[in-house]
């Protein structure tokens, strides 16, 4: 009899089963679910429920008052981050697409988040990040084109206060980042970002197998 776990009858690996269980264990409210649907409609990526929940936990653990997000999308990750931040916390979220930010703003409004708690900046993150103050942020979340990860990591670490954390999404690239035979531009950039974090003595990193891989690091 064919397995019901896979159309081809192949059972998922233990690792795949654990990740699937982690994702299925998270319930999203109607506002986040609606934002996720809009992300699909507009072709914008969105973090998985388990990744979102982890972002909320990290924001809570760092008692985040100031957070930077690179890649606003439809506001899914922003909603999760805000749910874990302090009530007086401010999320600065950057996206090159004004339409993404318009849709995200709708999600924030639906969630009852006051305008003073979000700062939406439309522009290239490469330009915006350099204008933000050193060591002024509790959490930096990078969810952008993998080829830009090294530059964003350098800027993100600069922004972190002592005790803060940086999180880089798409750190696994579907497993390609760990494939010795893969060496395309995305893989090379992701590996360089990981090297920058690993060699920074101020950082304690961990690679988390959720979503497309999360590389997280806490700053001493």
Curated annotation (Swiss-Prot):
UniProt: S-adenosyl-L-methionine binding residues: 47, 69, 71-72, 77, 95-96, 145
Entry's EC annotation: 2.1.1.-
Taxonomy, superkingdom: Bacteria
Xref: Gene3D superfamilies: Vaccinia Virus protein VP39
InterPro entries given in the database record: Cation-dep_OMT (IPR050362), SAM-dependent_MTases_sf (IPR029063), SAM_O-MeTrfase (IPR002935)
Family matches, as CDD domains: AdoMet_MTases
Protein family: Belongs to the class I-like SAM-binding methyltransferase superfamily. Cation-dependent O-methyltransferase family.
Name used for this protein in its record: Putative O-methyltransferase Mkms_4069
Organism annotation: Mycobacterium sp. (strain KMS)
